[in-house]
Design a protein with these regions (language model features):
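Compact nucleic-acid interaction/catalytic patches
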Residues: 20-24, 28-65
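C-terminal terminal-subdomain/extension
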Residues: 1, 66-115
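Short, surface-exposed secondary-structure edge patches
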Residues: 1-2, 32
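Feature marks short, surface-exposed loop/turn motifs that line or immediately flank catalytic pockets
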Residues: 17, 52, 84
């Protein structure tokens, strides 16, 4: 299975604990391709939700219906970034639009204080 940064995959995030995103849902691959190209057993992702929040500019990045083959308006939950086992990844559904990559990078840098 080949995984690439900024692809959107369906992943089974169950079981979920507390405020973690659970269910089978889309996730955005944010892990560097340096790791994706080797046989690494886990992948860093941001879950995607259809529970869109209008005023969460740092915590979320909005994806419009139709982007990356998503069937509804969605938010990438930057604050829910985590590593998952590759066995949780079910299938690729699309790619993040290029114009949103910098926004994702900036928000991750803010969330984990890399600036």
């Amino acid at each position: 299975m080949q995984i690439n940064q900024y692809e959107i995959w369906i992943a089974d995030l169950n079981p979920q604990i507390g405020t973690e995103a659970g269910k089978t849902r889309p996730v955005l691959i944010v892990q560097t391709n340096l790791l994706n190209k080797i046989p690494h057993p886990s992948t860093v992702v941001c879950p995607i939700t259809t529970n869109v929040q209008k005023d969460s500019h740092i915590l979320r990045v909005h994806l419009k219906k139709g982007m990356a083959n998503l069937h509804e308006n969605c938010d990438v939950m930057i604050d829910q970034i985590r590593a998952i086992d590759n066995k949780r990844l079910i299938k690729k559904v699309g790619n993040l639009p290029v114009e949103l990559i910098e926004n994702i990078k900036e928000n991750i840098a803010i969330i984990i204080d890399l600036e």
